[in-house]
Amino acid sequence: MNIPFHRPNIPRNLDKINTDSIKSGWLTTGSQVLRFEKKLSNYLLYKHVVALNSCTAGLHLALAAKEFSKGDKFLAPVLTFVSTIECGEYLGMSPVLVDCKRDGFLMDLNFIEDQIKRDPKIKVIIPMHYGGELNDMENIISIAEKYGLFVLEDAAHAVENSLNSKKEEYLNHAVAFSFYANKNITSAGEGGALATSNKKLADKIKKLS
């Protein structure tokens, strides 16, 4: 049996879209990109979306835009892709790994607040959604609000995750998505985006990208 690694849904008019983009003279950040950012923003219910080349870029730029100090720390799950950790380490931050739940693959929220209380250098929570399982974001954001922490979701596996009003209210928050070939939405092999309702953060990420 031959089971494909992925089988993306390619629209019939893709050739025309590509040709029109090339003929426009805008080979980057053209009208198609702006249109995509607007449509994704409306779909995800975030006020701002920045199209990028990968989810990794989204994680990196979000942390860079916040200008954390070297030696600051971030919470991340023990089970995750290497980018979740390396983006912070590249900027001089240190990870504090949180163990998984006994009945799933996501970080155990029971450990989060204890870690924050013990270490004032923790400035960021990076939850990762995995394999169709979503973190309890309302609970995570409530903890982040209590301690003034930045929440950066690694949603490479969850571009179509359900959103709630609690997220919309909390501006110290961003979400990074992946459009790699085997993800929910693909952009011909590679791609990503960063979503946030914080205009200042979105503007800075656009400048950095």
Q: Where are the regions that the model predicts?
A:
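Glycine/threonine-rich helix-loop capping motifs at alpha-helix boundaries
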Residues: 200-209
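N-terminal "arm"/small-domain region of PLP-dependent enzymes with the aminotransferase-like
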Residues: 1-27, 31
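Structural detector of well-ordered beta-strand residues that form the stable sheet scaffold
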Residues: 50, 75, 96, 151-152, ...
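Phosphate-binding glycine-rich loop
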Residues: 26-73, 87-91, 97-99, 166
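Active-site phosphate-binding strand-loop segment of PLP-dependent enzymes
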Residues: 103-187, 193-201
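Glycine-/small-residue-rich active-site loops that bind phosphorylated ligands and cofactors
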Residues: 10, 28, 80, 103-104, ...
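Conserved PLP-anchoring active-site segment centered on the Schiff-base-forming lysine
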Residues: 62-117, 126
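Aromatic/hydrophobic pocket-lining residues that form π-stacking "cages" and hydrophobic walls in ligand
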Residues: 84, 140, 205
